[in-house]
Amino acid sequence: MAPSFDTLSEQDLHEEEEEEIDFSDLKEQFEVKLEEGLDTFIVIDGLPIVPEESRQKLIKFLLRKLNAVGHTSEDAVFMPTNDKNMSEGFAFVEYETPEQAIAAVKQLHGTPLDKKHTLAVNKLMDIDRYGREGRIDEEYKPPTVEPFKEKEHLRSWLSDPNARDQFALYRNDKVGVFWNNKNNPPENVVDRAHWTQLFVQWSPKGTYLASVHPQGVQLWGGPAFSKQKQFPHPFVQLVEFSPGESYLTTWSSRPIQVEEGHPVLSFEEDGKNIIVWDIVSGKPLRSFVSHDLAGGPVEGDAAPKKKVQWPAFKWSADEKYVARMLQGQSISIYELPRMNLLGKTSVKIDGVMDFEWSPATVTRDGVKQYEQLLSFWTPEIGSNPARVALMSVPSKEIVRTRNLFNVSDVKLHWQSQGTYVCVKVDRHSKSKKSMATNLEIFRVREKGVPVEVVDSLKDTVINFAWEPNGGRFVLITTGEAPSGAAVLPKTSVSFFAPEKKGPQAGNFKLVRTIEKKTSNAIYWSPKGRFVVVATVHSQSNFDLDFWDMDFEGEKAEGEKDLAANLQLMKTVEHYGVTDIDWDPTGRYVVSSASVWTHSMENGWNIHTFAGQTLAEHPTDKFKQFVWRPRPPTLLSKEEQKQVRKNLREYSKEFDEEDKYAVDIANTAVVETRKRVLNEWVAWLRREKELMAEEKDAYGIPEDADDAKVAKDAPPVSEDQGEAVVEEIVEEIVEENEEVIG
């Protein structure tokens, strides 16, 4: 019988216990875990070779850098020496945790120790893993040089001979990129199913198209839109590019879970929500846990809603700095590309609610050193008033402050060139029963940064927008709407422009106010001058008003001292409109109705800057329309002035080209009709020839088809023979299918 548990006696069981003693607890206590023990060690190469008496001095100097990324001590640094009592140029360092060792490798590798020495930092486990016997061939083999493969031109679309613009169209499960052909059907460049799972997004200069997937973000580019880069961030939901397309920020509400051996992500990213990436290398620079913002007022016992802070990181105009805010406490400014905290500390600002970088590098009057400007605001805390301030970076110097009282909310609006920053202040009365808005406009480039106050507004401002590259702005105000009102409250649209006073812009004055509107959105042309004021996301009003701020007609008497001549060019209606997008040249405007908002009459319409509707494109399950941005012009200011000066001459050429294009289109229609007619004539000729052959075969006269000849023709005699034509018709009355077993 085969031995089994059932056949063993009680004595046998006790004998087995006496023979084998369980040492598992002792083994677990005293076993040396080689893999875990070495995870905290790093190897630093590239150190100066110094004598024994200078070794401790070098270690202390090295500790300044080592402790900037983790915690270690002088005893945890081993720097070996040779027979001549000289150091070997490398050292072993032990950190408290493996995470600190990983951070040291990422942040210290490649950093200069002094002018002559650059650190090379690696994990000790990596050296053991890749340098052990058998991993490296003893015999040198020259590397194989891959044949040169020319990369795609990532800005090839700019060389289009007709200077057309491209756009991305997301509908149903397909994403396509098309050329804009004005009122003609758009020309397809590429169209792919399941190209993205959430949305698509162009980079700021139009070089890349980003698609979002559960696995991460992919960047596409070139004439064929081939894959350029990929950034693995599981369940990514939001994407943000830096202004110069050098960096990328990704966010997910789910903390990242990094699997062992991941080719890109390390344990440093584990548990984080945000990753800042280097686009060129495709590697993460640093990862962070996201900070939620305080939500709005909560009714009853409901849990407070968390609001996502996005963009979580905001970039300076030159990409040298990126900052994030811990609401109510501080602003952390990081230097790129190392992502080190500027000055090794965050800027402590009690109560800070929001901040914004200047969108351009500003040169202030009387200030010669380089700086980036950052504006922020804090609410009223106790007896301290609310405060708006401008901070210079990297010095962290406060260059201007402004105290505010009875403040409910503040919004910061920078002009595109950094010339002005408008602080929109919503104030409540002392009884807190009524609200009003006033504007505090900082003139950043002027000496001392003077502040101009616009306090003529009686109602609350719900939207504000600066003119790009200009000094004018548009705002929308509304009175207090009764709670629960089903009808949109009436709004007023106000246009402001500076006075004409010498070389510098004068004070801002009201040009005109248009009352009894329902408008709630402002869309400036990227080139300035033209603006669309619209009603979006409404169930009852869908107006788009096209305005010209520099109308060339006669100017109203009361507006002659202002740098504006306002004229309504046209009002159009687009049912269910949800989004409005200007093309980067300011020539065309697209209004669209997305299925993400509602499912009624989805699609997109294209208009000229003056409001003429060129084409309507009803599209089932339409989701997103995005124009492809253009990089900044390479022309100097003088060359741009020359182009504007000769614009009328260029316009004649463009008119000729447009006329030629219309003629070509008409010629194409005529040619198509001629081709179809010629094909029909050729077919008719062939049929007549076949009929003539058949008549000849049967002895039928050529003119037998003529009605008169057919009537007068003699009857066919018997001796001429008869032709009998039989027609067999088969009809299935019933059909049965029987299986014979």
Curated annotation (Swiss-Prot):
Cell compartment(s), UniProt: Cytoplasm
Record-linked InterPro entries: EIF3B, eIF3B_RRM, Nucleotide-bd_a/b_plait_sf, RBD_domain_sf, RRM_dom, TIF_beta_prop-like, WD40/YVTN_repeat-like_dom_sf
Keywords per UniProt: Cytoplasm, Initiation factor, Protein biosynthesis, Repeat, RNA-binding, WD repeat
Segments for region (Disordered): 1-21, 696-723
Pfam families xref list: eIF2A, RRM_1
Single GO biological process annotation from the record: formation of cytoplasmic translation initiation complex
SMART domains membership: RRM
First and last residues of every WD repeat: 193-230, 232-289, 303-344, 514-557, 572-610
Gene Ontology molecular-function annotations: identical protein binding; RNA binding; translation initiation factor activity; translation initiation factor binding
Primary localization class, coarse: cytoplasm
Gene3D superfamilies for the chain: 3.30.70.330, YVTN repeat-like/Quinoprotein amine dehydrogenase
PROSITE patterns: RRM
GO cellular component, one term: eukaryotic 48S preinitiation complex
Biased composition regions of type Polar residues, renumbered to the chain: 1-10
Domain (RRM): residue spans on this chain: 40-126
Coiled coil: none
Known role: RNA-binding component of the eukaryotic translation initiation factor 3 (eIF-3) complex, which is involved in protein synthesis of a specialized repertoire of mRNAs and, together with other initiation factors, stimulates binding of mRNA and methionyl-tRNAi to the 40S ribosome. The eIF-3 complex specifically targets and initiates translation of a subset of mRNAs involved in cell proliferation.
Alphabetized PANTHER family for the sequence: EUKARYOTIC TRANSLATION INITIATION FACTOR 3 EIF3 -RELATED, EUKARYOTIC TRANSLATION INITIATION FACTOR 3 SUBUNIT B
Matches recorded under HAMAP family: eIF3b (MF_03001)
Similarity section: Belongs to the eIF-3 subunit B family.
Subunit architecture: Component of the eukaryotic translation initiation factor 3 (eIF-3) complex.
Protein name (record): Eukaryotic translation initiation factor 3 subunit B
Annotated source species: Aspergillus oryzae (strain ATCC 42149 / RIB 40) (Yellow koji mold)
Record gene name: prt1
